[in-house]
Amino acid sequence: MYETSDIRKGLRIVLDGDPFVVMEFQFVKPGKGTAFTRTKIRNMINGAVLDRTFKSGEKLKPADTEDREMQFLYSDGDFHFLDNSNYEQVSLESSVVGDASNYLTENMMIEVSFFQGRSIGLTLPNFVALKVTETTPGEKGNTVTGASKPAVVSTGYTVNVPLFVNEGDQIRIDTRTGEYVEREKA
């Protein structure tokens, strides 16, 4: 069991039978009364974010989640992964994969989280390299600073890129924000 003094960002706990992960926390010690910890927690199954306050000394149940490294194989409505430790294939519904589908490429290694034997989500690398398949030519001269244009990458995701990026270029995208980071060297 965890105590409120153990609360940290990334801590996984169980509330009302569902696994939650702590996104933010703040310890508050008022002048009068008992201390408490104010948290922002995210449900790992449905993604709902809650604000929850825990009194000092309150006990929290740890979430028995398991993270396994898996390789993305293909998608046919569902997403299919291979567990390299036992060569077992696992299918995830698109609702579990969510926005991560914008960045998945064949043979990509990711972490899949399981809770009570059921897959509840996946963790992508912070950055992925994707090929630009479609973009308009950048027009020079009619910009002041920081101009960008939309580009479609190999997964079908559309991202804003600087004018110098052309079709066929490899670009790095931050999977946490969905934004262009840099053009990769050829």
Predicted regions, residues:
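Acidic-enriched and Gly/Ser
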Residues: 2-154, 158-186
